[in-house]
Amino acid sequence: MLILVSPAKTLDFEQPPLTQIHSRPDFLTHSQELIQVCQRLTPSDIATLMKVSDNIAGLNAARFGEWKPDYSIDNAKQAIFAFRGDVYTGFDADTLTPEQLERTQSQLRILSGLYGLLRPLDLILPYRLEMGTALANPKGKNLYEFWGNILTDAVNNAVAEQGDYLIINLASNEYFKAIKPKKLAGQLITPVFKDFKNGQYKVISFFAKRARGMMARYIIDQQVSSIDELKAFDVAGYYYSEELSKPNEPTFLREAQ
């Protein structure tokens, strides 16, 4: 079972990681191509392109300028410990045991605009480059065209290594658009999380992001290996709804918080 998640805009490079064990991203040469494009952007260009404040644009211009591919554990951090956001709050990587961390490294993949597809222990430098950014580059007009089939092929390779052809998509639509579902060599399962509000069950972004992280952690903790086992997910008050589920979209409900 391979789990796909999105990265986070919120980063933590202050707190030391739980382990010195690390790996290197597979697509650093591609990352360097993108960095070279980004290094030509002014802070004003970045503010317009990414729709961010001048302060954030200036910070990211500096990050692009300082980025070098030969970074190490001394000035970088493993992705699973660097990303902080709702998904990662739900996943709570800081409480993983060494055995759970090993399973996470094997089963979890993080889609990234800059790095393509990350393993949890892959070292990253601070950056902001969302997958939906319309960054013109040598391969096209945006990052979806830049990555092309590369990430789909990488997911298929990871699935083949697992020997289990279940792919659990817990990524956002923005990031999963970088994958070509029809070319995936496995069964794609996309869980849906709905909370009760104003008289109906609906997807509430903040809660859904946390739930995706909690489900990813549940899969690791419980060593889930089948869809039936996935349906037993019951963290934080969620429960499986057969009535609202579709064959490849199991739906989980939660009452008003």
Curated annotation (Swiss-Prot):
InterPro entries: YaaA
GO biological process terms, semicolon-separated: response to hydroperoxide
Entry-linked HAMAP family: UPF0246 (MF_00652)
Family recorded in the similarity comment: Belongs to the UPF0246 family.
Protein name, per record: UPF0246 protein Shewmr7_3045
Pfam families: H2O2_YaaD
Gene Ontology CC terms: cytosol
PANTHER family found in the cross-reference section: PEROXIDE STRESS RESISTANCE PROTEIN YAAA, PEROXIDE STRESS RESPONSE PROTEIN YAAA
Highest rank taxon of the organism: Bacteria
